[in-house]
């Protein structure tokens, strides 16, 4: 059924956003309609057996994948944004990137107590963003049932930070 080698559609950008980092650019995959469709279909397959109410995803590329998956799976979508981007009252978490510190914000009423959540993002690198997303979901009373990523940078050992969670990835480096 699935036929594409999706790794072919990921472009390596050396020394971006800073020297020593190899950025895995998914825009060629997004640009190709067959690759994008197959990536979404395959990511949905990764979580077909999980029961959840909402897909939570961070900007920017997480929005693209998360919203598409939420639509395909018939679930609600919750955007998580950088500071100052959401119009209503928010709660936030700080986290470390492999190249700095950032904050993630979510509307304080985005998740109801007890709702089950799938977290979606484009790349699982250090696990810092995923940890912050988990903390946000828990802060609002939600339960993270799974995390799904298009790409995992296994050489950074991100799963160590996510022990105890169901982590699914499509492409592993």
Curated annotation (Swiss-Prot):
Enzyme Commission number(s): 2.4.2.7
CC per GO annotation: cytoplasm
Whether Membrane counts among this entry's keywords is no
Q: Name one GO biological process term.
A: adenine salvage
Catalysed reactions, semicolon-separated:
AMP + diphosphate = 5-phospho-alpha-D-ribose 1-diphosphate + adenine
* Location, primary (coarse class): cytoplasm
SUPFAM superfamilies, from UniProt?
Answer: PRTase-like (SSF53271)
Q: What InterPro entries does this protein's entry cite?
A: Ade_phspho_trans (IPR005764), PRibTrfase_dom (IPR000836), PRTase-like (IPR029057), UPRTase/APRTase (IPR050054)
Q: Which Gene3D superfamilies does the record match to this protein?
A: 3.40.50.2020
GO terms of molecular function: adenine binding; adenine phosphoribosyltransferase activity; AMP binding
Its UniProt pathway annotation is: Purine metabolism; AMP biosynthesis via salvage pathway; AMP from adenine: step 1/1
**What are the record keywords, sorted?**
Cytoplasm, Glycosyltransferase, Purine salvage, Transferase
Q: Where in the cell does this protein reside?
A: Cytoplasm
User: Does the keyword section mention Glycosyltransferase?
Assistant: yes
Q: What class of enzyme is it?
A: transferase
The job of this chain, per UniProt, is described as: Catalyzes a salvage reaction resulting in the formation of AMP, that is energically less costly than de novo synthesis.
Stated family: Belongs to the purine/pyrimidine phosphoribosyltransferase family.
User: What subunit structure does UniProt give?
Assistant: Homodimer.
Q: What is this protein called?
A: Adenine phosphoribosyltransferase
- Source organism per entry reads Thermotoga maritima (strain ATCC 43589 / DSM 3109 / JCM 10099 / NBRC 100826 / MSB8)
């Amino acid at each position: 059924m699935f036929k594409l080698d999706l790794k072919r559609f990921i472009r390596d950008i050396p020394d971006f956003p800073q020297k020593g980092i190899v950025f895995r650019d998914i825009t060629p995959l997004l640009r190709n309609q067959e690759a994008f469709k197959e990536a979404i279909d395959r990511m949905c397959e990764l979580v077909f057996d999980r029961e959840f109410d909402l897909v939570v995803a961070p900007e920017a590329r997480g929005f693209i994948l998360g919203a598409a998956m939420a639509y395909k799976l018939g679930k609600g979508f919750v955007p998580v944004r950088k500071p100052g981007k959401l119009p209503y009252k928010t709660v936030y978490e700080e986290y470390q990137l492999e190249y700095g510190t950032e904050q993630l914000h979510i509307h304080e009423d985005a998740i109801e107590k007890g709702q089950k959540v799938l977290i979606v993002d484009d790349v699982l690198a250090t696990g810092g963003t995923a940890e912050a997303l988990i903390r946000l979901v828990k802060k609002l009373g939600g339960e993270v049932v799974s995390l799904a990523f298009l790409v995992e940078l296994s050489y950074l050992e991100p799963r160590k930070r996510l022990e105890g969670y169901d982590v699914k990835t499509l492409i592993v480096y």
